[in-house]
Amino acid sequence: MADMSNGEQGCGSPLELFHSIAAQGELVRDLKARNAAKDEIDSAVKMLLSLKTSYKAATGEDYKVDCPPGDPAPESGEGLDATEADEDFVDPWTVQTSSAKGIDYDKLIVRFGSSKIDKELVNRIERATGQRPHRFLRRGIFFSHRDMHQILDAYENKKPFYLYTGRGPSSEAMHVGHLIPFIFTKWLQDVFNVPLVIQMTDDEKYLWKDLTLDQAYGYAVENAKDIIACGFDINKTFIFSDLDYMGMSPGFYKNVVKIQKHVTFNQVKGIFGFTDSDCIGKISFPAIQAAPSFSNSFPQIFRDRTDVQCLIPCAIDQDPYFRMTRDVAPRIGYPKPALLHSTFFPALQGAQTKMSASDPNSSIFLTDTAKQIKTKVNKHAFSGGRDTVEEHRQFGGNCDVDVSFMYLTFFLEDDDKLEQIRRDYTSGAMLTGELKKELIEVLQPLIAEHQARRKEVTDEIVKEFMTPRKLSYDFQ
């Protein structure tokens, strides 16, 4: 563990804090470049955010690169990165914020240049599909998009599109946060009646983690069982392992090479923070995640068509991959993929970071028993309640920081009941223990039902989902 003792006590003046933030930012980048342990990186990021919070408290201003306290701020955002521009740190591997409310998603929309999913777009989706919008849309869990109106234009004009999402299989067991994109993607598949490709990036996990190729592929197959248990239509869904599919699909590999030719090393360093010490596999991997965005990567499904647009539901931290993809697409003659971005599923300890499979106490796993779920929620779920019952009754709880309430916004279908819980908890009529009980009563059957469905997923079913084949959709 790196020595962080120079962080909070040793830096009194704003100028000392300024230099400490710069040094801590360099440490974070160095740890990521050296592939340090996740807990070491997380600890360094937390210290960085703490220093920035102290700096803002001391100066009344956000920390800005190359702008010591007392100097005027730069006129443009040039030179600012995600670590230094504000208090949120978001990339495909790390999500941290100093705010107990979680990431400021409005700022993230501005930073990433995407568009907010507003009421007008939600209503248009409802009109186009004839279905009530999913609770993830109604509640702003999927909050941002790129070109969703184009997808709806295509759908309304009887033009085809397809869905693409994925999973990085880093462990055998998935947690409930991993379900979010798949729950929503299943709904999209159902209401639009379109085919879906699901990429298992076992090659990525081999490159980033201390895994053998066989372990990475094994995790992909095991994770595929959990994904299949979400209820996807076997006649309209193709799940593929990169390690498996790349060697049997010339069309897929040709698109990977096209993308690689049109993205420079300097660009991927700028987008993903790669350094000269990263292996060349990492440098080239973004092209592999980009390739499923183009329909002719799957000739068994789309034949030789290159004009079928793709819609990608994913968490917002994956957007850098697809900003790169959208930049390349017109240069190689393909339509840009559209995207729907979700918020992060918070860790049990609070919304400052997302749930992680590497920390068993921060996660509710899909393999957990009813007893384990109850214990984890009661023991670890961060509360927005007051210190005493008397104070809570008088002042009420804070739903904006309460993890149990956050989880209910993801998994409780009944809007009226959710609103009643919010009112009761905010007013003090409902105590923290009662709120946690509500969550436990939602999570226990949800996970038990998932486990029952997963038991029905045989090796033969997995093989069928993962076999390249024509899907039940006519693209002529």
Swiss-Prot record:
Region (Dispensable to the catalytic activity): 1-117
Subcellular location, record wording: Cytoplasm
Pfam family, one: tRNA-synt_1b
Keywords: Aminoacyl-tRNA synthetase, ATP-binding, Cytoplasm, Ligase, Nucleotide-binding, Phosphoprotein, Protein biosynthesis
Modified residues (N6-succinyllysine): 159
Positions of the WHEP-TRS domain: 13-69
Reactions listed under catalytic activity: tRNA(Trp) + L-tryptophan + ATP = L-tryptophyl-tRNA(Trp) + AMP + diphosphate + H(+)
Positions occupied by motif 'KMSKS' region: 354-358
GO terms for biological process, alphabetical: positive regulation of gene expression; positive regulation of protein-containing complex assembly; regulation of angiogenesis; tryptophanyl-tRNA aminoacylation
Description of post-translational modifications: Proteolytic cleavage generates 2 forms; T1-TrpRS and T2-TrpRS.
GO CC terms: cytoplasm; cytosol; nucleus; protein-containing complex
Enzyme Commission designation: 6.1.1.2
Keyword DNA-binding found: no
Motif ('HIGH' region) on chain: 169-178
InterPro entries tied to this protein: aa-tRNA-synth_I_CS, aa-tRNA-synth_Ic, Rossmann-like_a/b/a_fold, Trp-tRNA-ligase, uS15_NS1_RNA-bd_sf, WHEP-TRS_dom
Domain of life, source organism: Eukaryota
Alphabetical list of CDD domains matching this protein: TrpRS_core, WEPRS_RNA
Disordered, as annotated region: 63-83
GO molecular function, one term: tryptophan-tRNA ligase activity
Membrane spanning stretches: none
Family the entry assigns: Belongs to the class-I aminoacyl-tRNA synthetase family.
Annotated function: T1-TrpRS has aminoacylation activity while T2-TrpRS lacks it. T1-TrpRS and T2-TrpRS possess angiostatic activity. T2-TrpRS inhibits fluid shear stress-activated responses of endothelial cells. Regulates ERK, Akt, and eNOS activation pathways that are associated with angiogenesis, cytoskeletal reorganization and shear stress-responsive gene expression.
Subunit structure of this chain's protein: Homodimer. Interacts with oxidized form of GAPDH.
Protein name: Tryptophan--tRNA ligase, cytoplasmic
Lineage: Eukaryota, Metazoa, Chordata, Craniata, Vertebrata
